[in-house]
Amino acid sequence: MIKWPWKVQESAHQTALPWQEALSIPLLTCLTEQEQSKLVTLAERFLQQKRLLPLQGFELDSLRSCRIALLFCLPVLELGLEWLDGFHEVLIYPAPFVVDDEWEDDIGLVHNQRIVQSGQSWQQGPIVLNWLDIQDSFDASGFNLIIHEVAHKLDTRNGDRASGVPFIPLREVAGWEYDLHAAMNNIQEEIELVGENAASIDAYAASDPAECFAVLSEYFFSAPELFAPRFPSLWQRFCQFYQQDPLQRLHHANDTDSFSTTNVH
């Protein structure tokens, strides 16, 4: 019998958070009961430590807060919540938002442009998200805005900027970089062959190593059946870093469902 941490005494039911309902999204149904219980414990601590700030009239209720916290904690389920140190606020727009972007080109000219963003992650600042794309992160499609931005935070723990190489033993860095760049090249080749819209992996992964790590982290957790067979060596490195194997988890869940179905009388 699993003792769920959110199941409280009868007198406290009014203040209990809806963790069981929050866990019902497709992305989290493959987790075992033990993993779900551990994830909820982390998410409870996350909500105690971080401030969720709704912007532009967005309404944040307890169910939305719980689901946001669960998705933040999924990548650090085995790493620990301390891996999410370094920020204290999560800003949430109702929809993708416009920002002023500034960059310097190869000859030193500075350009300014207003662009639409789904999310942002600053090394020593808040994470910025939007609810429309958070909702689209609930399924197992390969897209997950929260995991993408969390991956950037994990990436920057290794240095001053996101490099695509998280905090791993130094002896593993060269192999990680080799496999990551090989994946980027493979994704770029597919894009050139079939176009961005028809590519099986989000084309953004080919833009630079940091984005490749973030995008493939999305696929690692929400579409492992696409990631693992295509980049098996890099997949093993991700499993070792995150200390999770979502593909094995998916197969186990499917096997359990099949067994339950065949034993229904």
UniProtKB/Swiss-Prot annotation:
Chain residues that bind Zn(2+): 111, 148, 152, 211
Record InterPro entries: MetalloPept_cat_dom_sf, MtfA_enterob, MtfA_fam, MtfA_N
Listed GO CC annotations: cytosol
Superkingdom assignment: Bacteria
Keywords, sorted A to Z: Aminopeptidase, Cytoplasm, Hydrolase, Metal-binding, Metalloprotease, Protease, Zinc
Keyword GTP-binding in annotation: no
Cofactor(s), names only, from the UniProt record: Zn(2+)
PANTHER family the UniProt entry points to: MTFA PEPTIDASE, PROTEIN MTFA
Quaternary structure and partners: Interacts with Mlc.
Entry protein name: Mlc titration factor A
Naturally occurring in which organism (per UniProt): Escherichia coli O17:K52:H18 (strain UMN026 / ExPEC)
